[in-house]
UniProtKB/Swiss-Prot annotation:
Cystine residue pairs: none
Protein name: Myosin light chain alkali
Listed InterPro entries: CALM/Myosin/TropC-like (IPR050230), EF-hand-dom_pair (IPR011992), EF_hand_dom (IPR002048)
Domain EF-hand: 7-41, 80-115
UniProt key word Repeat: yes
Alphabetical keyword list: Motor protein, Muscle protein, Myosin, Repeat
PROSITE patterns registered for this protein in UniProt: EF_HAND_2
Keyword Hydrolase: no
GO molecular function: calcium ion binding
GO CC, alphabetical: muscle myosin complex
One GO-annotated biological process of the protein: mesoderm development
Length: 155
């Protein structure tokens, strides 16, 4: 596709190699995960609009079908950035010192917006969270930085 640079096409091909089966593409159920692996942040509604499914094995998305989806999602303006997430978490920062209660962050992730399940929150905290202090507070800016950093590729 003309508007996807060669390097990004290579990244997409790598994601397909990891997530899909040769010649068949990826399961449409995994569309959101594939886009997130490429540093995009699509909403569940956008994933569904782009052809994602709620059940496995309903349909496959081939590479040539995925590239226009990737390109369109990349142009989407409704993606949050670091500053947006920090502003949101400042609402929980009662002392205005860059910290919030871990329990409040956990509740927000489990119950608000496009909520996560318990296992997803546990994995997220294991990957991105500093230990809470004695009073249950965590520095939220470091959490957001780690959450939004580029994924680590192991050779």
């Amino acid at each position: 596709m003309a508007d996807v640079p060669k390097r990004e096409v290579e990244n997409v091909e790598f994601v397909f190699e990891v997530m899909g089966s040769p010649g068949e593409g990826i399961d449409a159920f995994d569309l959101g995960d594939a886009l997130r692996a490429l540093n995009l942040n699509p909403t569940l509604a956008l994933i569904e609009k782009m052809g994602g499914t709620k059940k496995r094995n309903e349909k496959k998305i081939k590479l040539d079908e995925f590239l226009p989806i990737y390109s369109q999602v990349k142009k989407e303006k409704e993606q949050g950035c670091y500053e947006d997430f920090i502003e949101c978490l400042k609402l929980y920062d009662k002392e205005e010192n860059g910290t919030m209660l871990l329990a409040e962050l956990q509740h927000a992730l489990l119950a608000l917006g496009e909520s996560l399940d318990d296992e997803q929150v546990e994995n997220l905290f294991a990957d991105c969270m500093d230990p809470e202090d004695d009073e249950g507070f965590i520095p939220y800016s470091q959490f957001i930085q780690r959450l939004m950093s580029d994924p680590v590729v192991f050779d």
